[in-house]
Amino acid sequence: MLSEQTRSLVKATVPVLQQHGVALTSHFYRRMFEHNPELKNVFNQGHQHSGQQQQALAMAVLAYARHIDDPSPLLPVLTRVAHKHVSLGIRAEHYPIVGKHLLASIRELLGEAAGDDLIQAWAEAYGLLADTLIGIENGMYGDATSADGGWSGWRPFRVAKKEIESEEIASFYLEPSDGGALPAFKPGQYVSVKRFVAEWGLSQPRQYSLSDAPNGEYLRISVKREDAAQGKPAGRVSNLLHREVQVGDVLELSAPQGDFFLHEERDGPAVLISAGVGQTPMQAMLGQLLKRGGREVRFLHAARHGGAHAMGAKVRQLADRHPQLKVHVCYETPRAQDAIGVDYQAAGRLNLADVKGIALLPDADYYLCGPLGFMRAQRDSLRGLGVAADRIHYEVFGSHPGDD
């Protein structure tokens, strides 16, 4: 428990964090990587170069300072962070390194304003946060290790099959190199994949949703090749996977993690809403729902056009075999060869108000995944159509769709 004085000192830094938070976290990462360069193999260097990670950490530090009197509302966020940490192999021994450089960065940036009392207050606050995360993560590591077919750390997998799904998405079917069992993960979860990037001289982890239901034979990831666009550099790891990785190659994987997953204990309808590569966790959910049977399923998907639409034929075949599955696909800019009524059902952007007859079902759970703008629009649309907040489950690849 933090003292009132400690909490007051931490809260007093909120205005500074609002104004200079990104400067602080940018300085922190530069400092930490200079003194502990081995950690570059743990952190996504693409996010470092884009500034995305610095921005995310600045927002997290600010949120913690604002909630220092009662951090309990942050528990869902901390749980999400812990899942990510476990997938990256972050352990208790990493926290003192982070704390050392965070406190040093506060002192170096604030100068005389960062007196000993303030540094001590933040040391205590960081210690409490670290202990909380370590406790959550230790539980997750234990669960991953004790599960049938589970493991901790990195496990080698052989690429048994590589399948081109669209102009920009490829699927990799991965079998354990050790011939061992696989865990019954929760559909919607992800794994971290580690690949050496020669250009940087670093191993780099990336998170990819598992795109097929648990089957005991393989894990499947479906990776979008991130091309350079609008000043944004190409994705190093996704391009390496597309260009270099072939059948027979070996990839290192973490055990499945993530707090976005299908609620299998419920028996009402499930409505899966996605855009682009955001359909990958939905594919795992869809496969599991149809395998188990007994629930109405809706699969709503938005793509730019048929060339970018992955797994469309597979979903159509599933709909032909399973009458409880209804599919609605929107192409924003369909090509001449894209057949309406076959490849897609509507042109333009997905508007749930236009498909209420398909999408709105009593007692349904709604699962959303896609780009941030898409996510906010679908979430707001569902709320406007009367869907309760606790029936909407979502995952954004990148940022969280919270209010600005």
UniProtKB/Swiss-Prot annotation:
GO terms for MF: FAD binding; heme binding; metal ion binding; nitric oxide dioxygenase NAD(P)H activity; oxygen binding; oxygen carrier activity
EC number(s) per entry: 1.14.12.17
Enzyme class at the top of the EC tree: oxidoreductase
Alphabetized CDD domains for the sequence: FHP_Ae-globin-like (cd14779), flavohem_like_fad_nad_binding (cd06184)
Keyword Ribosomal protein: no
Residues that, per the record, bind heme b: H85
Residues of the active site: Y95 (charge relay system), E137 (charge relay system)
Binding site for NADP(+): G276, V277, G278, Q279, T280, P281
Residue intervals of the Globin domain: 1-138
Site positions for Involved in heme-bound ligand stabilization and O-O bond activation: Y29
Domain of life: Bacteria
Binding-site residues, FAD: Y190, R206, Q207, Y208, S209, V396, F397, G398, S399
Protein family (similarity comment): Belongs to the globin family. Two-domain flavohemoproteins subfamily.
Described function: Is involved in NO detoxification in an aerobic process, termed nitric oxide dioxygenase (NOD) reaction that utilizes O(2) and NAD(P)H to convert NO to nitrate, which protects the bacterium from various noxious nitrogen compounds. Therefore, plays a central role in the inducible response to nitrosative stress.
Name by which UniProt lists this protein: Flavohemoprotein
Native organism: Chromobacterium violaceum (strain ATCC 12472 / DSM 30191 / JCM 1249 / CCUG 213 / NBRC 12614 / NCIMB 9131 / NCTC 9757 / MK)
